[in-house]
Structure formats: C-alpha cells, structure tokens
Amino acid sequence: MSSTLSNEESGLGDSNRSTEVDGGDGGNFTAYESRFQSQRFDSSFSNFDSQPEKESDLPCGDSSPRPETQSPPSINSFDDTNDSILPPPSAMEKEEGFALREWRRLNALRLEEKEKEEKEMVQQILEAAEQYKAEFYSKRNVTIENNKKLNREKEKFFLENQEKFYAEADKNNWKAIAELIPREVPVIENRGNKKKTATITVIQGPKPGKPTDLSRMRQVLTKLKHNPPTHMKPKLPSPSGADPNVSVSEQVTVTEKL
C-alpha cells in the first residue's frame, strides 16, 4: 500500500512540470505544466457521446429493476427463507418493572410473616383451650363431690325426721297433720332504700306465679277435728280390772257416764 502511494506521488511530481515564463514587463513567472492535457477531456467527452444508449434498447413496458439498482430487502418483510428476529408474542414474557418486583418481594415477606403470626395465635388458642378444659373438669369434679356430700347429709337428715315423724304420729295425730301441711306465708316486701331480698320462700302451685289454694284442705281438717273418725280418736288408758274384750267406744261411754 505504501509503495503504491509513493508511485502515485512520484507520478504526480513528474506530471507537474514547472517552467519559467518571461513576462513582458521584465518579470519571470513560474508556470506549471500538467501531463493531463485538455485534449484528454475532449476525447473522453467524444467517447461518451459516441457510446450507444443501452437503455433505449429496452422495451418501454419492462419495469424490472436493473441488477445494479436493486433495493435492499425490507426489514419487516416476512419471507420463507428469512425468519423473524423476535420470538412470537405468545412466547414473549411481559417485562416487569422494578416497582412491581419490589412489591411482589415485600408482599411475599408480609404474607410469610402473617402466616407465622396466625400459626402462633392458633397455637396459643389451643393451649388456652386445653387449660380451660382442665380447669373446667377440675371444678366440675369438685362441685360433684360437694353435691354428693350435701345430698348424703340431706338424705340422712330426711330419714331421721321421717322415722321420728312416724314414731310420734300415733301419739298426736293433729300435730302430724299440721306438719304435713306446708306453711304458706306471703312474701314480705321491704320498703325504703333497703335491698329487696326474699326472706321467706313461697311454695308455688301448679301454675307458675300463683300459690296453691289450701282453703278447702283447711275446711276438711276443721271438720275432721270436730268430728273425727273412730280410728283417729285417741285411745284412753283402760281402767284396772276392765274387760279387755270391751270395745273402746263402750269404754268411752262408760267414762262419760261416770
């Protein structure tokens, strides 16, 4: 390459020859003579004019482009031989921005922390439930034992009173009857600023809120008291020397006559 440039420079130096020209005023002027003379330009133009026009030989209707003037293939053209550079839209993944990726990361951490807190809360609830069940069953067992003990004491007291009642019923019938009748006393209402407390319990009747009417029972008992039947009359002690075969009514009649 360097040798070619040096040859061209040397040729140019030879072609440009300097000659001194004597001027009319007595001055000398240096003129440069080139080897490329004007007749070469004339000959080149004459040759250009003498060449036949090849384009005139082509038919007018031919629109096929010449091989040297063909345009390059379009970038967006889809040929069978040239595939597209980009993949199809269905295979392309949507690009996520930094904000969306950061939100997804923070959301995943938040969900993980929330799930951990929920598991801890559920565990605490289960432990509290187990503790409550244990306390409930222990209190229930204590209450059952106390109720059993109280019921045994009540049963014992009831049996003792029942035996005592049947032992004294033959001696005093009216006292036994009075004990069988419930004592009904109206509720005492406390007036003033004192706290209202029911000091006496009222035995309710068959209808809620209404006491049992015992007036008819009182009438029957009063009638029986004034005119008792034979088996309810008290037995009088038999006098000494009395006939044991004599009935009680006859003995009462004898005593009245006396």
Curated annotation (Swiss-Prot):
Main location: membrane
Low complexity biased stretches: 34-50
Pfam families named in the record: Clathrin_lg_ch
Region annotation Disordered: where it falls in the sequence: 1-96, 224-258
Residue segments, region Involved in binding clathrin heavy chain: 90-152
Coiled coil: 105-164
N-acetylserine: residues bearing it: S2
UniProt keyword terms in alphabetical order: Acetylation, Coated pit, Coiled coil, Cytoplasmic vesicle, Membrane
Subcellular location(s) per record: Cytoplasmic vesicle membrane; Membrane, Coated pit
Ranges of biased composition (kind: Basic residues): 224-234
GO BP terms in the entry: intracellular protein transport; vesicle-mediated transport
Topology term for the membrane: Peripheral membrane protein
Subunit details: Clathrin coats are formed from molecules containing 3 heavy chains and 3 light chains.
Protein family per UniProt: Belongs to the clathrin light chain family.
Task of the protein: Clathrin is the major protein of the polyhedral coat of coated pits and vesicles.
Listed name of the protein: Clathrin light chain 3
Organism expressing this protein natively: Arabidopsis thaliana
